[in-house]
Swiss-Prot record:
Enzyme class: oxidoreductase
Gene: dxr
Protein name: 1-deoxy-D-xylulose 5-phosphate reductoisomerase
Taxonomic source organism: Clostridium botulinum (strain Loch Maree / Type A3)
Entry EC number(s): 1.1.1.267
NCBIfam families according to UniProt: Dxr, PRK12464.1
BP-aspect Gene Ontology terms: isopentenyl diphosphate biosynthetic process, methylerythritol 4-phosphate pathway involved in terpenoid biosynthetic process
Length: 385
């Protein structure tokens, strides 16, 4: 029996993780959850799974859920805020913490969970992007597994198993290309949020959908891959693969390329991470090669999709530069969704902040949090948010 905490239980990954646990043949037990303010969803989760703990970040949502548990005589203990997230991430009985919250908010609870010896099923890209060196070193120190919960890194993880790191030539990260694959800059001038949110293959949250449209999502994954697998940026390639059947590949020095293929369904990497090192009966539709008919691969357009190019630059620069990139992107995506900037301005803001805020300093937790705050305050004042 594995005891699970889910940080971000009401989002896209969190919801699919619940589905995996639901069908987990009683080998997976949900002990604790966190959410921002989706109290209705939290109450439904409490009714079904009866977790010992539930954490809400927003005050009003916390009170509503707490009152529900008291009135319903349910034993779930309701906690609030970052302190609550850290508490449920470090519980002695927990085996694995699923970090599926979006953004920098996942960083501190993840580090605390690692320090408490918990395996991390990592769906929060920002944690490794802004503090990858710190996270990986702590994971090694505490003998903790960092298990990637996304299709690309989950695929790479599987393609590397049983092989020697020194035999790897390139890691090849596949990208669907998002809703604007094949478009040129001039065709993206009038893009609205509703257009960018329509992903052709994956059902995702709003922030990650915009990141997919700008290819920033793939840029963040490149930085993640660098830290997760210890591979230089020159040896991490991005290939656009619109069918989303090949989830990523590893090229070895002898010319062999090992690919992981499956029906595009996030439940597979979630199930693999939660049950690692074992494989369980599939919860997804089997791959039918007769229906696929063809698989295509293209080179990404880094001039049109500037954020991908900037992610490579930020990763190579190192230090706090990935934190600057990430902080600026989180704010820029929010500004775009609120109609305060145009789609193509997202990349421009990233470039502006990278030029303005870069300092040659180590990516310690304190430095990362400090520079992230500077970037957010600057953009907040600039756009009056």
């Amino acid at each position: 029996m594995k005891n699970i905490t889910i940080l971000g239980a009401t989002g896209s990954i969190g919801t699919q993780t619940l589905d995996v646990i639901r069908k987990g043949n009683e080998e997976l037990k949900l002990v604790a959850i966190s959410a921002n303010k989706s109290y209705k969803k939290v109450i439904e989760i409490i009714k079904e799974f009866k977790p010992k703990y539930a954490v809400l970040m927003e005050e009003n949502a916390f009170k509503i859920v707490e009152d529900f548990c008291v009135d319903s005589k349910i034993d779930t203990k309701v906690l609030k805020g970052m302190e609550g997230m850290i508490y449920i991430s470090t519980l002695e009985e927990i085996n694995t913490v699923v970090t599926s919250v979006v953004g920098m908010i996942g960083l501190v609870p993840t580090i605390k969970a690692i320090e408490s010896g918990k395996d991390i099923a990592l769906a929060n890209k920002e944690t490794l992007v802004v503090a990858g060196e710190l996270v990986i070193s702590k994971a090694k120190e505490h003998n903790v597994n960092i298990l990637p919960v996304d299709s690309e890194h989950g695929a790479i993880f599987q393609c590397l198993r049983g092989n020697k790191k020194e035999e790897v030539k390139n890691i090849i990260v596949t990208a669907s290309g998002g809703p604007f694959r094949g478009k040129k800059k001039e065709e993206l001038i009038d893009v609205k949020p509703e257009h960018a949110l329509k992903h052709p293959k994956w059902n995702m949250g709003r922030k990650i959908s915009i990141d997919s449209a700008t290819l920033m999502n793939k840029g963040l994954e490149v930085i993640e891959a660098h830290f997760l697998f210890g591979v230089d940026y020159e040896n991490i390639k991005v290939v656009v693969h619109p069918q989303s059947i090949v989830h990523s590949m590893v090229e070895y020095k002898d010319g062999s390329v090992i690919a992981q293929m499956a029906t595009p369904d996030m439940k597979l990497p979630i199930q693999y991470a939660l049950n690692y090192p074992n494989r369980k009966e599939s919860q997804i539709e089997p791959l039918d090669f007769y229906k696929i008919s063809n698989l295509t691969f293209e080179k990404p357009d880094m001039d049109t999709f500037l954020p991908l190019k900037l992610a490579y630059e930020a990763g190579k620069k190192g230090g706090v530069m990935p934190a600057i990139l990430n902080g600026a992107n989180e704010v820029a995506v929010d500004l775009f969704l609120k109609g305060k900037i145009e789609f193509l301005q997202i990349g421009d803001l990233l470039q502006e902040c990278m030029n303005k805020f870069y300092k040659s300093m180590e990516a310690t937790l304190e430095n990362v949090i400090s520079v992230d705050k500077e970037v957010r305050e600057y953009l907040g004042k600039k756009y009056d948010i």
